[in-house]
């Protein structure tokens, strides 16, 4: 049984990374894709765990070889997802999360229309600005740029299958878990998972 591909998108500061990490802690059968990026490593990040950090030259060479399922440029940095790794992980029966922006999501949907997509929103612009400020990673100028980008990004929520509002973290996490659980209980998935039982019941 092949796994399900999930696209998870959100504006910077909406809590996507924290929610996905909490979901992974509770769901061992789910994996998260590690993207390639040309942006610099932030404090606490580990190469190969958070991202595959690479040079712009190497990234463009991989792009030329058609190695990416999707790619996008965000804040002047390039991001991409290895198509071969995605296909291998799904073939192993594992569910896989792609944490990508709306541009990448559009590319993935064209190639893999069966992918499930989830958009995470903050409860307000004020809450989003506060979260970006509390990070302590960016200057006021960068925060203003991120806020402008966020408004543009959030307008694409209508393209997604599911919408999660991250007002209360625990509630948002429950919503995220419910999306994954409902997918696992679909008739076709259950039929594959319990083929032997169904055979005995209908014998």
UniProtKB/Swiss-Prot annotation:
InterPro entries: GK/Ca_channel_bsu (IPR008145), Guanylate_kin-like_dom (IPR008144), Guanylate_kinase (IPR017665), Guanylate_kinase_CS (IPR020590), P-loop_NTPase (IPR027417)
Top-level class of the enzyme under EC nomenclature: transferase
The Guanylate kinase-like domain, residue ranges: 3-181
The keyword ATP-binding is assigned to this record: yes
Enzyme Commission (EC) number: 2.7.4.8
SUPFAM superfamilies hit by this protein: P-loop containing nucleoside triphosphate hydrolases
Residues binding ATP: 10-17
Main location: cytoplasm
GO molecular function: ATP binding; guanylate kinase activity
Matching HAMAP family: Guanylate_kinase
Protein name: Guanylate kinase
Organism: Pseudomonas aeruginosa (strain ATCC 15692 / DSM 22644 / CIP 104116 / JCM 14847 / LMG 12228 / 1C / PRS 101 / PAO1)
């Amino acid at each position: 049984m092949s796994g399900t591909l999930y696209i998870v998108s959100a504006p910077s500061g909406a809590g996507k990374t924290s929610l996905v990490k909490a979901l992974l802690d509770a769901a061992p059968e789910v994996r998260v894709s590690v993207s390639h990026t040309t942006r610099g490593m932030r404090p606490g990040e580990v190469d190969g765990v958070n991202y595959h950090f690479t040079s712009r030259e190497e990234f463009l060479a991989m792009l030329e070889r058609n190695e990416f399922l999707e790619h996008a440029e965000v804040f002047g940095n390039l991001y991409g997802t290895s198509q071969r790794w995605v296909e291998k992980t799904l073939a192993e029966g594992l569910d896989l999360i792609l944490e990508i922006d709306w541009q990448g999501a559009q590319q993935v949907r064209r190639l893999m229309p069966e992918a499930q997509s989830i958009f995470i929103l903050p409860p307000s612009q004020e809450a989003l600005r506060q979260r970006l400020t509390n990070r302590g990673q960016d200057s006021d100028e960068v925060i203003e740029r991120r806020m402008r980008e966020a408004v543009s990004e959030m307008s694409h929520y209508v393209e997604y299958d599911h919408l999660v509002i991250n007002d209360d973290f625990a509630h948002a996490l429950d919503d995220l878990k419910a999306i994954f659980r409902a997918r696992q209980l679909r008739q076709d998935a259950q039929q594959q998972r319990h083929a032997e039982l169904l055979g005995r019941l209908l014998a």
